[in-house]
């Protein structure tokens, strides 16, 4: 709650607030300052190496001018994993709230439950959308699924907002909440196991998966069983949003983007739109592999891996070969009882021959970086360790 109070208080005082992740190290903040100057920090941590001057109990000033004609800033990790600040006008969110609240069925009777820091753009936006509608907000920063389930029941939450990996953890604990009518999620692909488990835990709910970015806000959404019947699809555009595909890249024309954004804008995600207007997210350009003269989308392969029985998490990486081709290695976690041969057979019914991974490795969990992204270096190390063994 204190994050939100300070954020709103700073805006009312005419300051341009930016919420930072608590896990950011001093060197990360130094890199952030080089990229986009920030005038001061409200923090209970002293950053000795950044040469800032105390300006009150919690304030530390950098002596720099932000130079942004904006109302607030949001963070994005970008392609490098390093935090970057993007600036927004209040209207870029406020004017879209009626649209997203209609799609997500948010009104003054809705009760939101969410988990994590408000420095995550999705959390902050969803919280502000509920405030705009006059709804009720509950949540915690604790990573404790048992606490989540208990809180959801006690608060009679109608909406749960979490990324799929958190929903997966939530569904592994006991409990049922019939008050929940909507599960809102994005940023990652869903699995059949998670969707089935959500139905058991929240029998009155429907799931809405969205695609968006800090730069763009919401772009498209897909609901319920369509998530299963259209692997790698991220739905149709929100009202007022246009999607254009240029050379395989997704371009979005939206009036609700960050300050200074071109129209249309691309985040360099790859995709396609089918004849029904459904957008398929195929990953980033650097996530395209080359196998026997064919381009293979990591996202497409990953979406089908996640639909295999018993899979909780999955990842796929390309191992470069001497001839320049990539060899796909799949990683699966969960209670996957089927043999590798059976899994390969299931994939053969859904993927082309060159899209099927060369090898499947079963792991306890998919390693993550501090920002929650897959740690591909550790996955490559696992491959080398298995090869040497």
How would you label these PLM feature ranges?
Residues 94-111, 118-159:
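Conserved AMP-binding/adenylation subdomain of ANL enzymes
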Residues 71-98:
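Conserved AMP-binding A3 loop
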Residues 268-355:
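AMP-binding/adenylate-forming catalytic core of the ANL superfamily
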Residues 189, 196, 209-210, 220-263:
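Adenylate-forming AMP-binding core of the ANL superfamily, especially NRPS adenylation
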Residues 159, 171-229:
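Gly/Ser/Thr-rich phosphate-binding loop
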Residues 46-71, 95-97:
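Flexible, low-complexity linker/hinge segments
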Residues 1-23, 115-117, 295:
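Conserved AMP-binding/adenylate-forming
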Residues 351-374:
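AMP-binding/adenylate-forming catalytic domain of the ANL superfamily
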